[in-house]
Amino acid sequence: MIPFGLNGPSARAVTLSVGTPDETRRPRVYPRAYPGAVPEQRRGLLLGVSAYGLWGAFTLYWPLLEPAGPIEILAHRILWSMLTMGLLVVVFRRTTQLRAILADRRTFLLLAGAALVITVNWATYIYGVNNERVVETSLGYFINPLVTVLMGVLILGERLRPLQWAALLIASLAVVVLTVDYGRLPWIALVLAFSFGTYGLLKKTADVGALESLAVETTVVAPLALAYLAWLVATGASSFGTEGTGHALLLVSTGIVTAVPLICFGAAATRVPLTTLGLLQYLAPVLQFALGVFVLDEAMPASRWIGFVLVWVALVIFTAEATNHHRRQLRLTVHASAAA
């Protein structure tokens, strides 16, 4: 998935946007008097909803790739995403930025690390969705913002405000409840949340555009993907070319499936406020959860509902506190500017 994030991507990934050269700036704040602000923000909202909506709806896409196994699907996604991203880098004229990444050893190593982490994330997500654990995968993306904050405390030494601590404690209680319910740790959710949190941290540190970044990341792991696919062909275990043209085209389409929501997100990030993107990020796990429960009929005993309700309470507290804090900071900035 992306989860993309693909916290889909978290609000912290906003500056890693993609698009045309004019769309790759940092998110803009439109003054109320600006005549094009409202249409631009509406367009951005539509693009943001499209991005997160697609990430959520792809829950129904990955099972279509069976009888290919999760690792074969992953290998094809890496390969076709690399080719798709390479083409888009040329189309959007990002080759200069790509060369700069390759010339900077530190940035390249950060993206190489990100490549390994997102590979784990993609593999876990595909495995979960194709093994009737869609609800558990949605949990991973619900708790991802909280895990990202926790990693900020543990790795970056950031300080939390009281309500942020409260949200983390409630979310921790939810994990305990769900562990008892499942009879095991909800490992799929935890791997998804922590892998995407780590991915976001590495990308934030690298601070490069998402399009050329993903082109580099998929190129780093492409040799492993190609080697695995070659082994499948050599052993007669490959589904590509043996399950019909439709199946082969679906595997090829994994590159487009990866690219389209990423482009929508990048275009949205330049048009809507951070707070709006922060709220939109919950659309993907909400759709995943709804599809898992109401379409795919996954079991939801009472204890599991309790665990998820606790997660949602934690997210309400976390989001409300973050929104209020952002507004206070804006007011302070306005007052400081007026005083100057």
Predicted regions and their residues:
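C-terminal-most transmembrane helix of multi-pass membrane proteins
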Residues: 180-181, 185, 282-340
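Structural motif at transmembrane-helix junctions in multi-pass transporters
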Residues: 67-72, 123-140, 263-280, 299
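Helix-helix packing/entry segments at the starts of transmembrane helices
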Residues: 139-143, 210-220, 259-294
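C-terminal transmembrane-helix exit sites in multi-pass transporters
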Residues: 127, 144-164, 286-305
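Glycine-/small-residue-enriched transmembrane alpha-helix faces in small-molecule transporters
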Residues: 16, 31-72, 173-205, 291, ...
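Hydrophobic alpha-helical transmembrane segments of multi-pass membrane transport proteins
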Residues: 53-57, 61, 112-129, 191-202, ...
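Membrane-interface interhelical linkers
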Residues: 7, 22-50, 83-111, 162, ...
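Hydrophobic transmembrane alpha-helices of multi-pass small-molecule transport proteins
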Residues: 85, 163-179, 188-194, 303-322
